[in-house]
């Protein structure tokens, strides 16, 4: 559904066939169409594997399903709360809340769009992890390494590109951007821990460790609210963005450390060193070409080159990941 929404929504935004004045109702209809299409496709696939359907209410089975499902539902609610409560608190706490909430939303919309791509990646990983956890933990650890290198390596490049070119990127979309640059940069810094959550949170979900995930998410909400209460009155949208970055970082570290302990992940410094070298290389390139008109292009090319040089993208490992998913 998300992939369909991204494709149709992106086409509607940038196509020459769309009207000059785009209304919010257009996106409501696009989202409704995507949900309906996904439902119909899912039903068509499901019907092939079922006998003649009939309605029958089994109370005990329904209760069993609810008991098994509610931890997942609670996790989704908690994660959405500590990810999206900042905008609500910003509007309520700050003296100029409506304006600051608008400034925050300018940057958050772009983060949310990238978040959707990450969710697609996590959705692909979940069944792979679930399947392999039943057979071999060693295979799962290889998959975690491959997926982490692939996703987080790309995210490091995205973070450098968006942070260093914040005014340019925001200027493509909005007219008044000066107040939004700082919040946008902190929000994009938070995309790296979000990527970590996609990997390690998905691994824990596939292993059924919902209790620890819900506990971490609950602590994330407490931390997020506390930091927002402290920072928003003085710093407004920037304070809310810092709160988001800090909260995502804390939850990512907690999930990562628990995964190390739970799955006995080897503590090899090489993996972390590769990401540090990638970040250092991109920082050097960004500093040296800071005044260049082609900074973004240089960063992208350099980032991709470094990713391959550091073997963060291993084509054989990716092929193995694809074959494992089948």
Language-model regions, residue ranges each:
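Residues that define the loop-to-transmembrane-helix transition and helix capping
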Residues: 24-25, 99-102, 181, 210-211, ...
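Membrane-proximal transmembrane or re-entrant/amphipathic helices at the cytosolic face
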Residues: 286-326
């Amino acid at each position: 559904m998300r992939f369909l929404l991204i494709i149709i929504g992106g086409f509607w935004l940038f196509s020459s066939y769309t009207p000059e004045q785009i209304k919010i109702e257009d996106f409501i209809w696009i989202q409704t169409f995507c949900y309906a299409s996904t439902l119909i496709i899912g039903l068509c696939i499901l019907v092939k594997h079922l006998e003649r359907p009939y309605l029958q209410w089994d109370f005990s089975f329904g209760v069993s399903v609810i008991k098994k499902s509610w931890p997942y539902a609670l996790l989704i609610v908690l994660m959405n709360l500590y990810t999206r409560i900042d905008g609500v608190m910003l509007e309520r706490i700050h003296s100029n809340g409506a304006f600051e909430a608008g400034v925050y939303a300018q940057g958050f919309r772009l983060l949310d769009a990238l978040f959707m791509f990450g969710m697609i990646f996590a959705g692909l990983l979940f069944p792979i992890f679930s399947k392999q956890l039943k057979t071999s933990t060693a295979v799962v650890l290889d998959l975690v390494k491959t997926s982490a290198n692939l996703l987080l390596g790309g995210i490091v490049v995205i973070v450098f590109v968006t942070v260093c070119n914040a005014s340019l990127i925001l200027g493509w979309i909005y007219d008044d951007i000066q107040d939004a640059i700082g919040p946008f940069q902190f929000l994009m810094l938070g995309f790296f821990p979000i990527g970590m959550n996609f990997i390690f949170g998905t691994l824990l979900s596939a292993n059924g460790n919902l209790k620890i995930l819900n506990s971490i998410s609950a602590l994330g909400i407490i931390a997020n609210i506390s930091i927002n209460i402290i920072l928003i009155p003085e710093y407004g949208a920037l304070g809310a963005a810092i709160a988001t970055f800090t909260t995502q970082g804390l939850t990512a570290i907690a999930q990562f450390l628990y995964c190390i302990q739970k799955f006995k992940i080897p503590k090899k410094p090489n993996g972390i060193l590769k990401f540090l070298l990638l970040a250092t290389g991109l920082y050097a390139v960004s500093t040296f070409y800071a005044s260049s008109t082609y900074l973004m292009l240089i960063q992208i090319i350099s980032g991709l080159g470094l990713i391959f040089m550091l073997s963060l993208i291993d084509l054989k490992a990716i092929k193995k990941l694809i074959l494992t998913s089948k």
